[in-house]
């Protein structure tokens, strides 16, 4: 005998299907926030950029490029994880 799916079960299942998209969007928001911080620190010559580059040991000129690349990667993962 086939068991009927309750409407609440179906809603829970639909929410579970959204989890990869929520994860990808969160990642995208975090990387975009970092990109904005790096961009403003380049414009204003703040110590934020200097702190980030000394932690990662990368030259100052490469830091904004790396932030842009990470944003592109997270955008791509958002596209590929969408059902």
Swiss-Prot record:
UniProt topology in membrane: Single-pass membrane protein
Major location (coarse): host cell
Entry keyword set: Host membrane, Membrane, Transmembrane, Transmembrane helix
Domain of life of the source: Viruses
An example Gene Ontology CC term for this record: host cell membrane
Ranges annotated as spanning the membrane: 24-44
Localization, UniProt: Host membrane
Protein name per Swiss-Prot or TrEMBL: Uncharacterized protein ORF83
Organism phylogeny: Viruses, Adnaviria, Zilligvirae, Taleaviricota, Tokiviricetes
């Amino acid at each position: 005998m086939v068991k009927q799916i309750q409407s609440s079960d179906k809603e829970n299942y639909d929410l579970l299907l959204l989890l990869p998209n929520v994860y990808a969007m969160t990642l995208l928001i975090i990387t975009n926030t970092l990109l904005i911080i790096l961009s403003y620190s380049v414009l204003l010559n703040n110590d934020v950029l200097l702190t980030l580059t000394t932690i990662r040991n990368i030259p100052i000129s490469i830091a904004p490029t790396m932030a842009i690349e990470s944003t592109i990667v997270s955008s791509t993962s958002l596209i590929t994880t969408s059902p």
